[in-house]
Amino acid sequence: MKDLLNLLKSQNQSKEFDAIRIGLASPDMIRSWSFGEVKKPETINYRTFKPERDGLFCAKIFGPIKDYECLCGKYKRLKHRGVICEKCGVEVALASVRRERMGHIELASPVAHIWFLKSLPSRIGLMLDMTLRDIERVLYFESFIVIDPGMTTLEKGQLLNDEQYYEALEEFGDEFDARMGAEAVKQLLEDIDLQAEVDALREEIPQTNSETKIKKFSKRLKILEAFLYSGNKPGDMVMTVLPVLPPDLRPLVPLDGGRFATSDLNDLYRRVINRNNRLKRLLELNAPDIIVRNEKRMLQEAVDALLDNGRRGRAITGTNKRPLKSLADMIKGKQGRFRQNLLGKRVDYSGRSVIVVGPYLRLHQCGLPKKMALELFKPFIFSKLEHRGLATTIKAAKKMVEREEGVVWDILDEVIREHPILLNRAPTLHRLGIQAFEPVLIEGKAIQLHPLVCAAYNADFDGDQMAVHVPLTLEAQLEARALMMSTNNVLSPANGEPIIVPSQDVVLGLYYMTRERHAALGEGMVFADVKEAHRAYGAGQVDLQAKVKVRVKEVAVDEDGNRTESFRIVDTTVGRALLYDIVPDGLPFEIVNKPMVKKAISNLINTCYRDAGLKDTVIFADQLMYMGYHYATRSGISIGFNDFEIPPEKYELVDAASDEVKDIENQYASGLLTQGEKYNKVIDIWSRANDKVSKAMMERLSKEQVIGPDGQPVKGEDGEDLMQESFNSVYMMADSGARGSAAQIRQLSGMRGLMAKPDGSIIETPITANFREGLNVLQYFISTHGARKGLADTALKTANSGYLTRRLVDVSQDLVVTEEDCGTDEGLLMTPHIEGGDVVVPLGDRVLGRVTARDVFTPTDKDNAVVPAGTLLDEKTVEMVERAGVDEIWVRSAITCETRHGICSKCYGRDLARGHQVNVGEAVGVIAAQSIGEPGTQLTMRTFHIGGAASRASAVDNIQVKHGGTVRLHNLKSIEKTDGSLVVVSRSSALAIADEQGREREWYKLPYGAVLSVKNGDQVEAGVVVAKWDPHTHPIIAEAKGTAKFVNMEEGITVRTQADELTGLSTMEVIDPKERPAAGKDIRPAIQLVDDSGEEVELPGGGTAIFFLPANALVTMANGAKIELGDVVARIPQESSKTRDITGGLPRVADLFEARRPKESAILAEISGVVSFGKETKGKKRLVITPKDDDAYEVLIPKHRQLNVFEGETVEKGEVISDGPSNPHDILRLLGVVELAKYITNEIQDVYRLQGVVINDKHIEVIVRQMLRKVEITDPGDTTLLSGDQVEITQVMEENEKANAADKEPARFERLLLGITKASLATESFISAASFQETTRVLTEGAVTGKRDYLRGLKENVVVGRLIPAGTGLAYHNERRRKRDLEEQGVTAADVEEALSAELNRES
């Protein structure tokens, strides 16, 4: 037995390797793999079921069918191992060699490999510089190609059809050589002199001017160099030998009834062999050319189908009309080799069952059914039984276990003790979807799960199933306990908030016990300590919610762990005192002295984790849960029909609304309103009515009369009935956050309100009934409409969200923390996140858990740093920074980290799931992908149509301050008018209001032409209007003073005058050039400023004060009017921007991560300079920007785009010229990486924030880092890179370092932004890319370039079956690398000498 095991071990001794290379197999290589040639298409003999000799299953070639037994049965058993039987020619070996031994087919004529021919760009085409159509014409025998023109007028590579060929033959005889088919292509490929071609192209590229040609050349140069450096031979793209897959990988299985189930590959191979044999025979017989040609073409098609069926022409189908699965189909797609067998394997020692709730379990436990445990731990039990001598053999032990003897259960108990098991619930969207627990044996067949981990698993008990896995090795058990135990996963990796938070019944119980009730039994009692209160409550002398005084003991723990106790008497309720009893030391009483709604409980656990540590938090969470369940049971809260109180005002409100709607219908009927206006008004009326009803309903629900202990209503001091917060069950459930919401209660006891159609538009007739009254048939049908769409959406959403997660994981999987500190001082500038003038996310929340990149200063004091650079900002530091009034902080970020492979611990900051600085080896890429992908299912799928209420919001025309404070003006350019007010003349100005601490509470953008009534540093009260502007026109402002002089303003030609009927004022409007008479087409009307003597006025910044007027501009002043500084010279009407659909939810997130260019994107200024307009073309305007000292830059802009800039203005690089959705590529090019990071982060956060999902910024930054891996070379300098190449940034850095070291010119480059799909496919590792998408393309490209995969990422290592280079696996990889470096150094003579002398000294 032992011998056999050793033999098996010796079989799979794999060599250690550090990289995998993919390349082209030469015919000799294929023959060297092969164990024999397959000559016949037969598979097995249908009578004897034995494989046919020389067939596709031949035992002589591929090995024996039974272990250690030849086919004829002459040699059996182990002792003949390795003997080759002389009768049947089969080697005696293990049958499993049939999985690894390959055969081959010698092809009678060469055949082009379809991947290199048809997968775009065609590699053969690039090498021969021919189009794919031409090559196909040669390959499929339609035309001849000249291989060697000899001394004739023909060219090498020229195509000739039959007639031309015969003409040429007559003319030149056999001077030249022209052939057709794959042999011609092979000959041409073999004739290429790679080095010469490369040199020629390298010389040619700098001499060409046309962009397209350079592109074409560099493509060809790339592939030629690839062949040159990888050592692949171009001729190998045309095969002469075809390898045959080992037979056990394409099995043939006899079914009952004499039929066979076979792999499609066998059919495809049979076709190839049949055609090949026929071709051989035809060639021997010297058959006519046309027949041979036809056979060769059929052979080519057969091999094509075998390699990649359906790639060319129609796919070959089997008997049942479905296309046969070719070799390419075997490896690609979800069912292919990569995703089905290499990245996702099924494992032994696992089971699954339904889950039920286990409320009495501790947090680290789960209930495991005895039956399952017995099955899962069987081998352990066998070994223990044998060890103890209770069973003599494994077989006896098996019997004992099957009989379930008493001793077996005792042993099971021992085996299971302290042996953690893993529980997994599909879908595993983030790492908390698999956690470790200690099993507790239970009766029954369902797994019991601790209620507090349900949130992490997203599990409920309506029939969910979970899988159990057993970690076998000691290391696995250790990791399960130290890293995966549910007690170690209290915080969510996505945002650092606790994820072990009570929900539903527990929240309800805790809320009920911490509410206060007026006039309850025992109100006003005083207790010496909590225990006394507990006794009184147990004796029924005081109510749980009674307001009492209790003396509590508070323990304060300072940072060094010193404890100080203090006692005080607090006003509280009995329930809160009881709750405080289980709170760990170090937390103040205030934290529980309020009704514990869900938010408060979450905050309590968070504070507990930060102040009392992990261990206490876990114990506390359990106690909290037990207590919550206990009091939820004691409360007796239940829902009755009467709890849904319908407010009596409802009916009046509904009637009033109906009357209003009738009026509007009448107005519409008499033609006073349009259809759209009527629709909007009706919907407005019903929304308002619905709001009023729900308000009345909530008021009614949330208040109730106080009833004393004697059952009588209690009167207040003024003699009125005393009211208190309601104890209505429905209200308590919603208020505590246990279940339900105001919106749901509204549907139950208010009115259901307006319903939506599937396309998102709102149906005019609302549902006035609620669920308590019941819906009539019409109402029921209206509500089914939207509900169905909801269900369909959910299904789609899940699939889309899963796909997004997969792409995210794929792009970020190889990002691991690899070093402590990369030493950069770059970072991102963090500011509070503003929306609509309000601070939505304060600065503190954004920088918590990050490392400062530069010293942090307050806005007032720029000398003394509040926090030095390189500090990890924890809760205490953040609080200090906020108190100091800091308004911006530079923090280190994943995007600016300079670590080569991976990222450094400092740039990442805090590990959110653990609360301390991140460890080296943490797979931050995958964590980021999971954190962004996991909430994906909560995002909406729809695009918001701006309609109804949203689109009629009045345009903003002023800034009204919400809080009092100090005015701060940011990058303001302004002109002071005569009355002292300021006029804004820059486009990127902003106004902020800071409070006493210096924190900016509000933040507003100031448009061009806004008039400010305050200056920088002024104090303002809340509610003051500080700025005004006209939202409908864009002003042109005089930056100098003088007299207006009209230029080219000719009535009826360039301008038209209109007089206002009411005021009598006349306005001049500039006519659009399209509508002008011929004489005025090219004239540009303008207003010039002149001084009193008629001389031109100079502008302060240089240049004359002349204002060109664009089309439709309005001028209200007369010629010769006096103009002061800051006056409005002319106004340009702004068409209200068309309402665009806002893409929201998941599609928006996907668009951002895929870096898609939006339609009609914003146009940004490419350089800084002065704006002017050039000659217009049809449908386009020509915008020219002229910088101070450089050439002008021109851009053509479609006429329908509205511009924000006007003639003669100065713009800064990257400023918006025409509004629209931002294009991330432009932001990166013009404003840089930091701005891009800010843009993508904010945009994605906006989508998630709308759904109430909190994700830390750094996860998004990690993904953005991966999207920015590639750069485009703009100038190669003296490096080996090519201009226009796209390469990894690390590669450029290494090249530049080499260049700098040799005092050569380094390469210059531009950062590129790739979408996540593209970035995944462009990774260094071909294994990772191939297992993601477009497998064929990735492998083809990899093979041609002879790519090496250094197995740096996680995915590649999973595929080759190694530990991943992250977490505990990183140590293994580092150790291997260290050993390898040592081996490379080898032993020097000095080392030997030293060792010898040491040895001699020791002996003496």
From Swiss-Prot:
EC number(s) on file: 2.7.7.6
InterPro entries listed in its UniProt record: DNA-dir_RpoC_beta_prime, DNA-dir_RpoC_beta_prime_bact, RNA_pol_asu, RNA_pol_N, RNA_pol_Rpb1_1, RNA_pol_Rpb1_3, RNA_pol_Rpb1_3_sf, RNA_pol_Rpb1_4
GO aspect biological process, one term: DNA-templated transcription
Molecular function as annotated in GO: DNA binding; DNA-directed RNA polymerase activity; magnesium ion binding; zinc ion binding
Binding-site list for Zn(2+) 2: 822, 897, 904, 907
Catalytic activity: RNA(n) + a ribonucleoside 5'-triphosphate = RNA(n+1) + diphosphate
Lineage top rank: taxon: Bacteria
Cofactor note: Binds 1 Mg(2+) ion per subunit.
Annotated residues for binding of Zn(2+) 1: 70, 72, 85, 88
Keywords: DNA-directed RNA polymerase, Magnesium, Metal-binding, Nucleotidyltransferase, Transcription, Transferase, Zinc
Pfam families: RNA_pol_Rpb1_1 (PF04997), RNA_pol_Rpb1_2 (PF00623), RNA_pol_Rpb1_3 (PF04983), RNA_pol_Rpb1_4 (PF05000), RNA_pol_Rpb1_5 (PF04998)
Cofactor: Mg(2+); Zn(2+)
GO cellular component: DNA-directed RNA polymerase complex
Residues that coordinate or bind Mg(2+): 460, 462, 464
Catalytic EC class: transferase
Quaternary state and interactors: The RNAP catalytic core consists of 2 alpha, 1 beta, 1 beta' and 1 omega subunit. When a sigma factor is associated with the core the holoenzyme is formed, which can initiate transcription.
Role played: DNA-dependent RNA polymerase catalyzes the transcription of DNA into RNA using the four ribonucleoside triphosphates as substrates.
UniProt-listed NCBIfam families: rpoC_TIGR (TIGR02386)
Family note: Belongs to the RNA polymerase beta' chain family.
Matching PANTHER family: DNA-DIRECTED RNA POLYMERASE, DNA-DIRECTED RNA POLYMERASE SUBUNIT BETA
The protein's name: DNA-directed RNA polymerase subunit beta'
Organism (species): Marinobacter nauticus (strain ATCC 700491 / DSM 11845 / VT8) (Marinobacter aquaeolei)
